[in-house]
Structure formats: C-alpha cells, structure tokens
A protein has these predicted regions:
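C-terminal helical cap/extension that packs against the catalytic core
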Residues: 10-29, 45, 119-120, 128, ...
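A conserved short coil-to-beta-strand element within the FAD-binding core of flavoproteins
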Residues: 33-42
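Short, small-residue-biased leader/transition segments that mark boundaries at the very start
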Residues: 1-5
Length: 242
C-alpha cells in the first residue's frame, strides 16, 4: 500500500502532492498537521530539537548534522519510521534508540566539517533554494566569525543568483574557482563572472594547499556536489598526511 509522508512545502506543491496521494488512496502524514518539530539549539556537533506526533509524546532529540533545516529532515525520518512500523504492526522504536541513531548520522558534503584547524566546511548547496538555508545556518552558527566562501557550480545552475546571495553574507569574502568536469564552467567563463562581480578567481588545489598551511578563518567550500567529489578526497588525504 502506498503512503505519503511530507515535510513543510509551499502551498502549491503541497496541493499537487496531496492531490496525487488522494487519487492513489495513499494515507497522508503531513508536517505541522500530523507531526511537529521545534529547533531547540544549534551546536557545531549538530542540532537539538523537540518532536511530537499522534504516535509519540513530545521529546527532545539530537541529530549529528549541522544546519537548522536538518532538524526538520530528522523529524521527517522519525515520521517515516513510525508510519512504516505501525503499518507492519511492529512496536515503535524507543526514544532512546531513535536518538542514538540520529547521533550516528553522517552525510558527506552537507555542512560537513573536514578540518578543525583551520576549520573547513563542505556543503553541496547547488541552487538558490539550497543556498538560502545554508547561509541562514552560517549566520546562526558563526555570527561574528570571518568567513571565506570558495564557490563554483555547473552550467545548468543559477550562477548569477547564487553569487548575489553569497555576496549578501556578512563578514565574508567570496572567491570563485572552477574544476575539471565537462559540466563545469570554463576558466574563461569563471574569469568573466569574477570580473563582473569584482571577485578573486583561484585554482582550487593551490588555494586549499595554501589555506591548510596558513588559513586562520572559517572556509566554506560549496556550489556543486560534483566539485565536492573532487575536493573532499583531496582534503581528507592532505588532512590525514598532516
């Protein structure tokens, strides 16, 4: 039997999804209506939040992911688990087991800290919709800390819109780069974007090598999951060798 379990959505998207669910006679479990989540605190080790539903009493949980939106993602996961267990006639997982599982969550490339000194954070935000909550999380977690953003994206993404978003982040500087991939912007295209927005353009390998040796600010590497698939192993390898 099909089911529909949804997070908070724009009204139009919600209507479409719930309309399809009704057509397919799929029971609907919806954020706010059937379960609620409230962020309690954000730490460098994750998020603390309260969760309540018709199936569970209100309780606090912690998820080992940065970004305030991850509390909602964790709440959605709890709801899915509870609906599936109930459908199969199984006893719901205890609060302690759920909390233990959330403590062990790892999501490479999603506000992932890959170096502590200097602090380097990776996030695959690759469109304006994803950049907005990332910026909100950075403002919340690092309100007064100086930040450097190393950014690139692939050709199918909204480069101009994301550049404007990043330039609005306080206490930060934006640096552009590109990478070897047929989907990536060319060196010339990135140079043109850097010139238009009066930004620095760098070779990412050289930049990261220098940063690991001399960097003293928070560095966020972002813009493309394809880009991070090259950056992440590079950083982890050099971090391990150091």
């Amino acid at each position: 039997r099909q089911m529909c379990i949804r997070d908070r959505l724009e009204a139009e998207a919600s209507q479409v999804i719930e309309g399809i669910a009704i057509q397919k006679q799929a029971p609907i479990t919806a954020y706010d209506r059937d379960y609620q989540v409230e962020l309690e605190a954000s730490y460098l080790s994750g998020q603390s939040f309260s969760y309540h539903s018709s199936k569970r009493e209100t309780a606090s949980y912690q998820v080992a992911l940065l970004g305030h939106h991850q509390a909602r993602n964790a709440a959605l996961a709890i709801s899915i688990c509870d609906v599936l267990f109930e459908r199969e006639g199984r006893e719901l997982l205890s609060r302690e087991l759920v909390d233990e599982a959330l403590h062990q969550v790892v999501w490479p490339g999603r506000m992932e800290v890959v170096s502590q000194n200097p602090m380097i954070l990776l996030d695959g935000a690759h469109n304006p919709h994803a950049v907005a909550p990332l910026i909100a999380s950075l403002r919340e977690l690092f309100p007064s800390q100086k930040k450097t953003i190393l950014f690139t994206c692939i050709r199918t993404k909204a480069l101009e819109e994301m550049l404007i978003q990043w330039q609005e982040l306080e206490n930060s500087r934006l640096i552009l780069t590109t990478f070897e991939d047929p989907r990536a912007y060319s060196q010339e295209e990135i140079k043109a974007a850097a010139k238009k927005h009066q930004l620095e353009k760098v070779n990412w390998q050289e930049f990261l090598q220098n940063w690991q040796a001399e960097g003293d600010e928070l560095l966020i590497v972002t813009g493309s999951l394809y880009f991070l698939s090259q950056v992440r192993p590079y950083l982890l390898k050099t971090e391990k060798s150091n």
